[in-house]
């Protein structure tokens, strides 16, 4: 029977909103989704959420490079990410963004509570500054040699080789990632979270069973080396949330990123009109369960900073962190040059989602081991397991049931003992899914598939079908095979959602965990259609080649507004102050006889009229649409004599030219003549 229903909140680490989802990301999202789908099958109330991590200097700089706003970039990236996850059947209840009202409010709330409770400290620090770019350098924009293990080319916040965390000022021979310049030291006041105050609590939490043994052991090393106060602020320019009452200071991305779990759940509750669940799940004494699926590279933040922040601000801590390893391809780190750095969208252009879901699941355990995607083994395993063992079991029997018995299965089981063997396995398989011992669960299921196919081989329905007077035997044998297929697909339903839907359509029944205790007897199935196709190595070759081509395309010269029209040389504020920009109302707009480029605009500056010629005719072939609209003009530009008359200023527009010219307009409420500052 189904266990007592639990309330569970599950999250995946938030993908960073400056790049595409790749197969490394997909390991975590598939692992979490399989676990979530199993929990739902067992009747538990699961909320499965995620969001884009949308703040930080990398996003700010990439948006500048693309010539768009950070807001536009993260919006477009969020749509891409959500499309990729949907393509892999990741069953999120909500996918949000850390750049949201919910996240801002919660970040400010947690910060304020930490400050009121004495856990925020202020002090002036010496910080690395890029003298060429005129900006303080975030941790990830400084590279150098790790001060702990001496590994070269490591980022300024943590070492990817030994896992150590440190200040960027501790790096040996640091360099700016932005310009390549050697950074200089500059003083700046920063805000620190007093992590050492939570050392005792964190050590107790570590021993509580909330962490895998490997993670707990690693944390013990960090405790022994001593916890340090954590710098949670960054200086402008920065894309993120400004710290309350601290102009020019912003929350470090790693402060508001995990709060994004809360923000996404709050957004989900608001969408549902649910005013109670947020507090119910996040209050300090909550009996709901909270699980974070994360990669081993971000354990430090999730096992130390995050629970301490929650404790210090009066919220509950995670029930458990489920940490996984990295993905390698063909035994090596994913490589763009070898075509093994594969984007999720590229995969879906060549293979279905179920194939990768199955392969990853078959290799996953509860340990923090790396997973190797061996592409040749992938083809062999998918064909051997899904096609030959599982789908073939249905196809070998369905034809006889459909053609000879009009789709109606036998009234009794041909081999009740064998069926009991299959249903008795539900306990062990369920425990394996629950414990994230996915590989073990798959091995158990495939062992049953072997038993089922052995039964069909021994009973040989294709022989029985030719023997007179054995119709009842044929119906019983094939019905038995289909019933065993149903049990196998029920066990595999968390892994193979698309194949499961097709199986349900054929079986004419929903696959539920408890229903397998009752076999399908005298049940009518639908006409069998091919459930799954074999995959070929030529598809792998095409996938790898496509990935190489994408890398070449990405390496092509950057195009876009900034590339076409680079930013001009720096000017002083005094230079800028000489330009008098004013709001102007377009009273009239008309063609200029003798010119195919110009429009004559009559502008009202709040009592003063101006005549301006503007080369925007191609963009506005009907000048009447401009009448009554407000724009911005340079009001103190010296009058220019033209053969059509005198132009008394210049209106502001953006775009490369021709039809792609866009007249600038102020927000509603601006009045003609007001100065633009």
Curated annotation (Swiss-Prot):
Q: Which InterPro entries does the record cross-reference, listed alphabetically?
A: aa-tRNA-synth_I_CS (IPR001412), Anticodon_Met (IPR041872), Met-tRNA-synth_bsu_C (IPR004495), Met-tRNA_ligase_1 (IPR023458), Met-tRNA_synth (IPR014758), Methionyl/Leucyl_tRNA_Synth (IPR015413), MetRS_core (IPR033911), MetRS_Zn (IPR029038)
Q: How is the cofactor bound?
A: Binds 1 zinc ion per subunit.
Q: Which GO terms describe its biological process?
A: methionyl-tRNA aminoacylation
Q: Which residues form the tRNA-binding domain?
A: 575-677
Motif mapping: 'HIGH' region: 15-25
Under the heading NCBIfam families, the entry gives: metG, metG_C_term, PRK00133.1
Cited function: Is required not only for elongation of protein synthesis but also for the initiation of all mRNA translation through initiator tRNA(fMet) aminoacylation.
Question: What is the protein's name according to its record?
Answer: Methionine--tRNA ligase
Origin organism is Enterobacter sp. (strain 638)
């Amino acid at each position: 029977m189904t266990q007592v229903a639990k309330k569970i909140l599950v999250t995946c680490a938030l993908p960073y909103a400056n790049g595409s989802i790749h197969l490394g990301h997909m390991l975590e999202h598939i692992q979490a989704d399989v676990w979530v789908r199993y929990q739902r099958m067992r009747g538990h109330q699961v909320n499965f959420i995620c969001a884009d991590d949308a703040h930080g200097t990398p996003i700010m700089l990439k948006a500048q490079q693309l010539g768009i706003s950070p807001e536009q970039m993260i919006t477009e990236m969020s749509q891409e990410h959500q499309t990729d996850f949907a393509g892999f059947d990741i069953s999120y209840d909500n996918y949000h963004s850390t750049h949201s009202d919910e996240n801002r409010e919660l970040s400010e709330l947690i910060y304020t509570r930490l400050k009121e409770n004495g856990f925020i400290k202020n002090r002036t620090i010496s910080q690395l500054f890029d003298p060429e770019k005129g900006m303080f350098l975030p941790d990830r924009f400084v590279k150098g040699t790790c001060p702990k293990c001496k590994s070269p080319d490591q980022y300024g916040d943590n070492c990817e080789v030994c896992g150590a965390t440190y200040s960027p000022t501790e790096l040996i021979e640091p360099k700016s990632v932005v310009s390549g310049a050697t950074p200089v030291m500059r003083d700046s006041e920063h805000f620190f979270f007093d992590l050492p105050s939570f050392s005792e609590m964190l050590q107790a939490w570590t021993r509580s069973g909330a962490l895998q043994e490997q993670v707990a052991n690693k944390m013990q090393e960090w405790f022994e080396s001593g916890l340090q106060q954590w710098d949670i602020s960054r200086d402008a320019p920065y894309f993120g949330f400004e710290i309350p009452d601290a102009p020019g200071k912003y929350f470090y991305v790693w402060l508001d990123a995990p709060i994004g779990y809360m923000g996404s759940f709050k957004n989900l509750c608001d969408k549902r009109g649910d005013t109670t669940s947020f507090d119910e799940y996040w209050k300090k004494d909550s009996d709901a369960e909270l699980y974070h699926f994360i990669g081993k590279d971000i354990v430090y933040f999730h096992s130390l900073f995050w629970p301490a922040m929650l404790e210090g601000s009066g919220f509950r801590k995670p029930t458990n962190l489920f940490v996984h390893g990295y993905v390698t391809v063909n035994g090596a780190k994913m490589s763009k040059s070898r075509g093994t750095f594969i984007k999720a969208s590229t995969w879906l252009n060549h293979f279905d989602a179920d194939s990768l879901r199955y392969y990853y699941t078959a290799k996953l355990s509860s340990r923090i081991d790396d997973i190797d995607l061996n592409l040749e083994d992938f083809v062999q395993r998918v064909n051997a397991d899904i096609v030959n063992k599982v789908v073939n079991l249905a196809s070998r029997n369905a034809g006889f049931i459909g053609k000879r018995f009009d789709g109606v299965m036998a009234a009794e089981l041909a081999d009740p003992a064998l069926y009991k063997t299959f249903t008795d396995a539900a306990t062990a398989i369920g425990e394996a899914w629950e414990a994230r011992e996915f590989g073990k669960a798959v091995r158990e299921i495939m062992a049953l598939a072997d038993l089922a196919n052995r039964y069909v081989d021994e009973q040989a329905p294709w022989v029985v079908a030719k023997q007179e007077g054995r119709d009842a035997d044929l119906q019983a044998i094939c019905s038995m095979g289909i019933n065993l297929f149903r049990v196998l697909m029920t066990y595999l339903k968390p892994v193979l959602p698309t194949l499961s839907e097709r199986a349900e359509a054929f079986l004419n029944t929903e696959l539920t965990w408890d229903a397998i205790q009752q076999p399908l007897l005298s049940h009518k199935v639908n006409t069998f259609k091919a459930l799954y196709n074999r995959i070929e190595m030529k598809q792998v070759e095409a996938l790898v080649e496509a990935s190489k081509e994408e890398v070449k395309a990405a390496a092509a010269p950057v195009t876009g507004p900034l590339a076409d029209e680079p930013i001009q040389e720096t000017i002083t504020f005094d230079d800028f102050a000489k330009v008098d920009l004013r709001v102007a109302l377009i009273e009239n707009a008309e063609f200029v006889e003798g010119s195919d480029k110009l429009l004559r605009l009559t502008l009202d500056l709040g009592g003063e009229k101006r005549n301006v010629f503007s080369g925007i005719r191609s963009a506005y072939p009907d000048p009447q649409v401009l009448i009554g609209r407000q724009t911005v003009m340079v009001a103190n530009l010296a009058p220019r004599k033209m053969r059509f008359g005198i132009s008394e200023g210049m209106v502001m527009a953006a775009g490369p030219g021709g039809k792609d010219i866009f007249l600038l307009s102020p927000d509603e409420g601006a009045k003609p003549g007001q100065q633009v500052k």
